[in-house]
Amino acid sequence: MAMAAAMGVASPYHAAHAAASTSCDSLRLLVAEGRPRRPRGVASSSSSSSSAGRRRRPLVFSPRAVSDSKSSQTCLDPDASTSVLGIILGGGAGTRLYPLTKKRAKPAVPLGANYRLIDIPVSNCLNSNISKIYVLTQFNSASLNRHLSRAYGNNIGGYKNEGFVEVLAAQQSPDNPNWFQGTADAVRQYLWLFEEHNVMEFLILAGDHLYRMDYEKFIQAHRETDSDITVAALPMDEKRATAFGLMKIDEEGRIVEFAEKPKGEQLKAMMVDTTILGLDDVRAKEMPYIASMGIYVISKNVMLQLLREQFPGANDFGSEVIPGATNIGMRVQAYLYDGYWEDIGTIEAFYNANLGITKKPVPDFSFYDRSAPIYTQPRHLPPSKVLDADVTDSVIGEGCVIKNCKIHHSVVGLRSCISEGAIIEDSLLMGADYYETEADKKLLGEKGGIPIGIGKNCHIRRAIIDKNARIGDNVKIINVDNVQEAARETDGYFIKSGIVTVIKDALLPSGTVI
């Protein structure tokens, strides 16, 4: 069972980095004696002239090229905890994830039985020794704020580093009466706060991606290539490449061209030699494209220059600021990430990512990695109780009560209550925010009400059941008519990509058939 790892949220990564500090001293000397750094934001000479007729490998690393094991130490000088500010972008209204975003911000959507989406980038930061983190949002931020304050509190990383995880909601002022207009605009509106921090770089992250990444190696590559901006890049085959914004690089790994979801000849023109970024020859032939992950390291003074001086009206990093920086001659470098990554922007992607953690023998994404745990709110719930149930290929969260039912290839969230005779297949149950007492259930029964959870003899297949849903007895949620798209909000559910999603706090009377 996936148990919360947040009981001592600061200690695992803080102790590890403290223990590694001695072994890093010799490497710090090598970094200190590297090539002289040019002023940030000043355009460097062209890559052709710098190459001088020879090909130079950039200092860019991927998980395949450089091991993430403890034997491969990453040594930043100065340390990431004091020199890097993490900025997580909460995204827009989350219309593609609706109705999961009806009552919550997108980063607050539950994930993997015990967690929320925001726990992924925050945990990646903490495991990478980045302990100063802001989360920017403007829609339904109450539950996100509550989760972050309970999960991470203050003094993340210890009193020495004075770490924090803080939500910054969009606000109107006499100087700026507008809400966030995009990713770059969101950062611009809070530049006055970010520039007060004595850091070298800003790490820009998305709040709706599922992946595990060592940001210290990302930042190390940024510093060692003397870049103004470094963009995390994902290798792609031709089939997937048409759905992403692609980048073209020169022989040093420097980004020279962008194309948004290209097709045909334009797609062919974006092919690159991915061995430059660390892929072996076989993988490079399979993956001849690189896509932007929407993750950036941007030097502090470069960020200030770009958002205030060069592109004061730009709203988006990916389509405006980053290509613009390339056009004015800044050094924009690619950093290859060759691991599992999923943009959880749609109901279908969210559904597949959750069920992917049940995959055998190795899940798409594992919550059981001791070297880089995923932290979350400590809830102090009892162990789950399973009574005469048949549970296969599933993940069960904390505090569940499961009685004489069948569960297969499903994810069952916190405090889920599943009654006798129920069949749950290929589904995601998000659970509940609270327990109902036996007295509450008795009173509900006397009034003809339905308790939170899954009633007796229900059959649920290929569905998402949001929190606190009340599903009566003998309900079938199996998409009997194979409907692909339907908006039945007044009835308590939506269907997107053939997946039935029951809305948070919805009530489905006994005998309902969907």
UniProtKB/Swiss-Prot annotation:
Q: Extract the CDD domains matched here.
A: ADP_Glucose_PP, LbH_G1P_AT_C
Composition skew (Low complexity), residue ranges: 41-52
Q: Which domain of life is it from?
A: Eukaryota
Recorded GO molecular functions are:
ATP binding; glucose-1-phosphate adenylyltransferase activity
GO cellular component: a single term: cytosol
Q: How is its activity regulated?
A: Activated by 3'phosphoglycerate, inhibited by orthophosphate. Allosteric regulation. Inhibited by inorganic phosphate (Pi).
From the UniProt record, list the reaction(s) this protein catalyses.
Answer: alpha-D-glucose 1-phosphate + ATP + H(+) = ADP-alpha-D-glucose + diphosphate
Q: Per the UniProt record, which EC number(s) apply here?
A: 2.7.7.27
InterPro entries, A to Z: ADP-Glc_PPase (IPR011831), ADP_Glu_pyroP_CS (IPR005836), NTP_transferase_dom (IPR005835), Nucleotide-diphossugar_trans (IPR029044), Trimer_LpxA-like_sf (IPR011004)
Give the metabolic or biological pathway.
Answer: Glycan biosynthesis; starch biosynthesis
Q: In which tissues is it expressed?
A: Expressed in leaves.
Transit peptide (first-last residue) = 1-64
Sorted UniProt keywords = Allosteric enzyme, Amyloplast, ATP-binding, Chloroplast, Cytoplasm, Nucleotide-binding, Nucleotidyltransferase, Plastid, Starch biosynthesis, Transferase, Transit peptide
Q: What happens when the gene is disrupted?
A: Shrunken seed endosperm due to a strong reduction in starch synthesis.
User: Region Disordered: which residues?
Assistant: 35-74
Name the residues that span the membrane.
none
Q: Which residues form the signal peptide?
A: none
Biological process (GO), any one: starch biosynthetic process
What family does the database annotate? Belongs to the bacterial/plant glucose-1-phosphate adenylyltransferase family.
Job of this protein? Involved in synthesis of starch. Catalyzes the synthesis of ADP-glucose, a molecule that serves as an activated glycosyl donor for alpha-1,4-glucan synthesis. The chloroplastic isoform 1 is essential for starch synthesis in leaf chloroplasts and the cytosolic isoform 2 for synthesis in seed endosperm.
Q: How does it assemble?
A: Heterotetramer composed of two small and two large subunits.
Q: NCBIfam families of this UniProt entry?
A: glgC, PRK02862.1
Q: What is this protein called?
A: Glucose-1-phosphate adenylyltransferase small subunit 2, chloroplastic/amyloplastic/cytosolic
The scientific name of the source species is Oryza sativa subsp. japonica (Rice)
Gene symbol here is: AGPS2
